[in-house]
Amino acid sequence: MNISTPKERSPKQHSPKRRPSSFFAIISRMRYIERWSLMRNSRPENLSEHALDVALIAHCLATLGNVRYGKHLNADRVALIGLYHDASEIITGDMPTPVKYANPEIRDAYHQVEDTAQETLLDTLPDDLRPVYQDILNPRKASEDADEVYTLKLVKAADKLSALIKCIDEAQAGNSEFVTAEASTRSIVIDMAQDLPEVRDFMNEFLPSYGETLDQLL
């Protein structure tokens, strides 16, 4: 009788031990960062809510560009950039717009603070993941690639549209605190729509429904 020898077992494959990363624990704290902090809000808005709105709107704008205007944008990436676009504010807090842009010196100094905060966030990632998130948190603003430049314009427009929607919601709630902010933000968005037909389409087709009741929406 032949007795077969047991097959040799291959040694277990062990993945390299990696240090714990605090990146997503930090990102989860977006919910604690309050926006519009210098203004009386009928309903406070946190950074996490704003990030989701910007991501959804940015994805829509990119999709409009691809479907209607012959663009070849990566709509998923546009949404991701929108989702993380204010992540540095977890560290810096939300700087009110009138203060941030009060003069060129403050604006430039704040941008440097933002860049440092982004680097701090990226430093918490595992080394092999850092390049992926570097491209999302700090996209190539000086890129010569036309699609990349257009992507960042759409994310900026989505950010302003989200702010306009917040102003509309506050006005509908009877809060006169946001009247001036709504007028100035709407003016900025209208200017953007001159160069970005996707923004014009969003304003014409989607924006009017904001502020309606649930019965009106359905």
Predicted regions and their residues:
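Alpha-helical, largely C-terminal catalytic domains
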Residues: 1-218
